[in-house]
Amino acid sequence: MIEKEDLLKVARTEMPFGRYRGVSLIDLPEEYLLWFVDRGFPTGKLGELMQLTLEIKINGLEGLVKPLKNDN
């Protein structure tokens, strides 16, 4: 079960490193996330959120998450 808190984090957490530093996880290109499938996601919560982001994108559900970026 996906937790609402995790969806909010996917929408509001920015990538802390690399080419897409400062970009919200939900706005990362799917190809970039797929690169981590081959190379390994970061450990910890960031890696979990990145994997969740990829699942959201693969299933075409970005439209449900993007509005949460600005929802307070």
Q: Which residues fall in each region the model found?
A:
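DEDD superfamily 3′-5′ metal-dependent exonuclease/proofreading module
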Residues: 1-72
